[in-house]
């Protein structure tokens, strides 16, 4: 039961964090490219690498907290569905290069940030 509560509470916090962070990014750089979605996904990629690697190397993060942080918070923070929708809209609008850049940037930068999170955790 504690795990379910952790997922729900951290999930709510992750959703709020996504809304606030993406909104701040869009307010700062505009909406010509899906920077807000890219930002939350990149942050989430780094954090999942950090949290998972750290939890594999130590017992400092209880299982309920790890699940709450990864499935709950990061599940609420990151968004593959919004990434998919925004990319589809770019394609529909004929913005083929922008759509391709979005896909490549999302995949490559997120993978790099996951690796960076893992490397960071290994040096803690």
From Swiss-Prot:
Chain's role: Fluoride-specific ion channel. Important for reducing fluoride concentration in the cell, thus reducing its toxicity.
Membrane topology: Multi-pass membrane protein
Protein name: Fluoride-specific ion channel FluC
Keyword list, A-Z: Cell inner membrane, Cell membrane, Ion channel, Ion transport, Membrane, Metal-binding, Sodium, Transmembrane, Transmembrane helix, Transport
Binding residue positions for Na(+): 75, 78
Pfam name, any one: CRCB
Organism: Geobacter metallireducens (strain ATCC 53774 / DSM 7210 / GS-15)
Subcellular location: Cell inner membrane
One GO BP: cellular detoxification of fluoride
Gene Ontology MF term list: fluoride channel activity; metal ion binding
